[in-house]
């Protein structure tokens, strides 16, 4: 695959009961830290082109087209967030990646949080870009109270 005018990533696939997930990787060695980029809803792997170009040669890189997005289409819509996290784990196992740093944008951040919840010992780090926390313990009672009383902004 060509990104930022440089051939950086190898395209691979991962089969699920709902369809095929397409992902791209650049694996330097299994001892190198791996960055996993997860784009948000309606975005595809190209969202992270600049980051991939910057980190190439310094880190292992994996980026996917999320289930039912771009190259990962067609895809049956009978899955949930935790299925996505399990499939991500399957991809990481297939690539023999241990302790990645997951970088998720919007919906990709939710997948990263679900992965962290299911596999806390298999994660080196998590970076969220425009994703709200999934777990209640990250939101204060005051924030919940305020959110329930806000007028719609539309």
Predicted regions mapped to residue ranges:
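N-terminal cap/lid segment of alpha/beta-hydrolase-fold proteins
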Residues: 2-20
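Short, well-ordered alpha-helices that flank and scaffold nucleotide-derived cofactor binding pockets
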Residues: 50-53, 57, 90, 117-121
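Gly/Ala-rich beta-loop-alpha elbow adjacent to hydrolase catalytic centers
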Residues: 104-108, 112
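Active-site loop/oxyanion-hole signature of alpha/beta-hydrolase fold enzymes
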Residues: 16-18, 24, 62-103, 118
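Structural signature of beta-strand start/N-cap positions in the alpha/beta core
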Residues: 34, 60, 98-101, 122-125
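Flexible "cap/lid" loop of the alpha/beta hydrolase fold
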Residues: 113-118, 124-154
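Conserved HGGG/HGGXW glycine-rich cap/lid loop of the alpha/beta-hydrolase fold
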Residues: 19-74
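Active-site micro-motifs of SAM-dependent methyltransferase domains
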Residues: 43, 68, 109, 133-134
């Amino acid at each position: 695959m060509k990104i930022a005018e440089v051939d950086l990533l190898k395209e691979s696939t991962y089969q699920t009961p709902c369809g095929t997930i397409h992902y791209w990787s650049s694996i330097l060695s299994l001892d190198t830290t791996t960055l996993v980029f997860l784009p948000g809803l309606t975005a595809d792997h190209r969202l992270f082109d600049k980051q991939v170009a910057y980190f190439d040669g310094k880190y292992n890189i994996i980026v996917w087209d999320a289930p039912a997005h771009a190259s990962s289409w067609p895809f049956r819509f009978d899955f949930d967030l935790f299925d996505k996290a399990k499939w991500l784990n399957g991809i990481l196992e297939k690539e023999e990646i241990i302790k990645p740093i997951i970088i998720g944008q919007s919906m990709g951040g939710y997948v990263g949080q679900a992965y962290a919840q299911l596999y806390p010992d298999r994660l080196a780090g998590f970076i969220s870009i425009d994703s709200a926390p999934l777990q209640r313990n990250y939101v204060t009672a005051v924030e919940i109270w305020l959110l329930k009383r806000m007028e719609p902004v539309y």
